[in-house]
Structures are given as C-alpha cells and as structure tokens.
Regions:
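C-terminal binding/interaction regions
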Residues: 118, 122-123, 136-166, 171-173, ...
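Glycine-rich phosphate/pyrophosphate-binding loops
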Residues: 62-63, 68-73, 77-79, 233, ...
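Gly-rich Lys/Arg/Thr-decorated short loops/hinges at beta-loop-alpha junctions or inter-strand turns
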Residues: 24-36, 110-116, 190-209, 286-308, ...
Length: 393
C-alpha cells in the first residue's frame, strides 16, 4: 500500500492539486484495486467503512451502507429478505443470498432514488452474489476488507473497468486526535471513539418500558447510522434496516419530516398497487425507480398521462389515491426512530407517530423533555434517553 494517492481534483474540478496521504509517512490503510476514486469518493468510503465496521461490532451481523455526499442514504444488517423485499429491491432470481448480500440490498433499498450513483460499503468480504447485484446498479464505487476472486472480476469489469474498488485493512485504527483545515486554520479534536451498544438504551423514560430485542437492534442501527450522517439528522429503522434518513437539516423537525417522508415512501413501495405494476420490457432499474417514485407521489399524472404512461408501463396503472396512500401508511407500525440530538418540542414525536414510529432513541436534555415524554406517552411509545449527542460534520 502507498503512503500517498494523487487524486484528479478535490470537491470540484477547479480545486487542484488533490491527494490523500498519511501525515507520518506510513502506508495508507487503503488500496485501490480498480478505477481511480476521487476526493468525495474517499470521503464516502472512509465514513461508510467506519459505519459498517461499528454496526457489525455492535450487532454481530454483517453490515452494509449506501453513501452519497458523505451521508448514508441507507444502512442495514444482513437479515434475510422476504419475498416482498426481493420484489421491491429487484432481486430477479430465487437463488440463496449471503448475509452480506442481503445487507447491501437492504441498505441500497432504503432510498433507491438517493442511492443512485452511491458508494457502497461492506463490513465483510464482498462475495460473488453481492457483486452481481451491484453490477446491475448505478454506483460509483465500493469499499470492503476484501473481495473473492469472482467478485473482484465482476466489479473490475463494471463501467468498462472504471468502477472504483477499494480494499481497506480491517485492523487499521486511526490516531486518537484528528485535524481539519478550514480557510487556512487548523481544527483539532479527539476522534469519536464512543461505543454505541445496548447499555446506551438503559434509561427508558416513558411509561411503556418494553423495548424488545428486535427494536434494540433497530435503535443501534439508527444511532450508528446517525453517528456518520451530516447533522442535524434523524433516522427511521425497521427490521435492521434504515428506511428513512433525514440528513443535514438546520431544523430538527425538518429532519424528522424528511426521515418520515422517506420511510413513508419506502413503505408505499410495498402497496399492492405498486407491487402489481406492469413495466415495459427492458426497462432499466433506475427508470423503474423513477416511475415508482412519481407514481406514488402527488405528481402521478407525470407518468400516467396519455402518451406518458406507455413509456413506462405495459398496462396503464390505476391511480394510487391520497386516501389509499394515507390508509396504507396508517398500517405501518414498529418503526424505530433515532435522533442525533434532543427533541426541543413534542412536534417531532407527533410527526414520527404518523410514520408508524413505536420506539425512539434520543439524547434528551431539552428544557421541554417533559413535553416530549408526554407526547410519546400519548401514543404508547417506548423512548430511551441516550444522554449522548452524535453530531457529525
């Protein structure tokens, strides 16, 4: 491994020169096996690797993430896919999937529109089944601790040999302090080594104290996802999978709305009318995603108008009405929501309830904690105060 890698440019083409390197002259813990990753690619790679590594350490399950612009569009652990999962994530065969393949398919499926052109991260060695799935997705690159020969051959051939494949030393531990230069001024802070585990969920402040094992895993998934999401951030999780990440908003309730809206979209993809859509032959996955996204929105006429629907569908679909969407979303339950900082008002809990949130993990510490707890109690939610802020910039 080299001690320095020259990059094409920085965040933008005019920002040259650009490189990554080790200040102490030691070898980089990463090796490029294919392609030529850029500056933002490596920001995604190194943030996403930390997320999946910590997620596996905390849960004992293989983990994956799908990153865009230094925040996760999705993250998940390697639980099996249901038949509905296979359909909405475009798994086109009935073959057995490895746990790491399931983890990435679920991470990618959290918000397929945002994951278009993603950076993939795997906690475990990338196998052939995972590589075959990525082969058919629009993606910029991948980081993993290793690749089987079959997987590497598939990925190295993607995008005419330009797909970015990065291998990282899984034993690498970063220094205790980190620095960042802004406008010529150097900032220094301790690296965030804080460990997220079940001990963080001990202070359940609501009348409902029942947080089952599955919900505890979902809380851990949400909190570790938030630890590597640009703040402010809120994350909805169900069955070990992020289903809505509200990232980078200045207003906490806007984070909650964004995460909730994305969770609603994820759930609407499972509506019988959506599952029954008949697409034209040969349609690409990305075009199916676009068509579904518009179909379930209030702008559905954009894909259902005469002369338009024929571009997407073999049979013209019936409209999915607002009433049908609301009725379907109302059946969602058992969702976990995490927040990287405290809720200042109960309105966040009110919005969370509309997306089926039953469990909440947030730091607490607001002067209106009583109002937040009261609102959670109104809906019978179980809420844990973690007493730990998870800002990330």
């Amino acid at each position: 491994m080299a001690s320095e890698l020259e990059l094409k440019y920085g965040c933008n083409p005019n920002q040259k020169p650009s490189r990554i390197y080790m200040k102490d002259g030691s070898e980089l813990p990463v090796k490029v096996l294919s392609g030529k990753p850029g500056y933002i690619n490596f920001l995604d790679a190194l943030n996403s690797w930390q997320l999946v590594r910590e997620l596996k350490e905390a849960t004992g399950l293989p983990a994956a993430a799908s990153f865009k612009h230094v925040s996760p569009a999705g993250a998940a652990v390697g639980l099996p896919l249901s038949d509905v999962d296979r359909k909405i994530y475009f798994v086109d065969d009935e073959g057995e999937l490895s746990p790491i393949a399931c983890a990435y398919i679920r991470a990618r499926g959290a918000d397929r529109m945002s994951s278009y052109g993603d950076w993939a991260a795997l906690s475990d060695v990338c196998d052939e089944r995972t590589a075959l799935y990525i082969k058919h997705e629009v993606s910029d690159g991948i980081i993993a601790p290793g690749y089987t020969p079959e997987a590497l051959a598939i990925l190295s051939a993607k995008k005419g040999g330009k797909y970015n494949v990065v291998q990282i030393d899984p034993d690498y531990v970063c220094p205790a302090t980190e620095t960042k230069d802004v406008f010529g001024i150097t900032f220094e802070q301790g690296h965030n080594f804080f460990r997220i585990d079940r001990d963080l969920l001990a202070d359940v402040v609501t009348a409902n104290k029942d947080i089952p094992e599955s919900a505890q895993i979902d809380m851990i998934v949400s909190l570790i996802t938030l630890k590597y999401t640009q703040s402010n951030s809120v994350c909805c999780v169900k069955d070990g999978q992020a289903i809505g990440v509200g990232a980078g908003q200045q207003s906490r309730v806007h984070c909650t709305r964004l995460a909730g809206n994305k969770a609603d979209t994820w759930y609407l993809r499972q509506h019988p009318k959506v599952l029954g859509l008949k697409f034209v032959d040969g349609i690409r996955r990305a075009n199916r995603d676009n068509a579904i996204d518009v179909y379930i929105s209030d702008e559905h006429d954009d894909v259902l108008a005469e002369g338009e629907w024929q571009k997407w569908f073999a049979v013209k679909p019936e409209v999915l009405t607002r009433e049908e969407k609301a009725a379907w979303i109302a059946t969602q339950t058992g969702v976990t929501l995490g927040s990287d900082a405290f809720f200042p008002f109960g309105d966040n809990v009110e919005r969370a309830h509309k997306s089926g949130v039953t469990y909440i993990a947030e730091p607490g510490g607001s002067i209106r904690d009583d109002n937040v707890i009261e609102t959670a109690d109104k809906y019978g939610m179980a809420m844990a105060f973690t007493h730990m802020r998870l800002f990330h910039h």
